[in-house]
Amino acid sequence: MISENRLSKLRKEKGKYAYSTENRIFAWKNIIWPLLLEVNRPWFTLKEYRTKRDEVSDTNHIPKEKIGKGLISLIFKGLVVKEKENYSIDDNLLPYFKKRIILEYNIAVRETRI
């Protein structure tokens, strides 16, 4: 587990924006996209997200808070859309989901900006 002092030092070294991007990439690559492929639908519930987040957090020894910041950041970026009880992906990403392609973060960002 990374101490708060170490996280603060990382933010200063990399910069605030690089740190946020790192959180988004990690959340997308390790939680959001694999979860969507697992549940086999373009949306997921908060309970499903938390289960996957806890699994990834325990496996990689990363604080849950860091991963949670990644989800929030993905919502602000527009890759993930919050709808009442569920979270879904942007409509422009549906063709990738239907083909069950491993979608990299940079491609997802580019597709949502179109």
Predicted regions mapped to residue ranges:
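Short, amphipathic alpha-helical interaction segments positioned at domain boundaries
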Residues: 94-114
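A short, conserved structural fragment
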Residues: 75-85
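Short amphipathic alpha-helical interaction segments
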Residues: 59-76
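Minor-groove-contacting beta-hairpin "wing" of winged helix-turn-helix DNA-binding domains
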Residues: 85-92
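Short acidic, hydrophobic short linear motifs in intrinsically disordered regions
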Residues: 41-55
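Short alpha-helical segments that sit at the start of domains
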Residues: 2-43
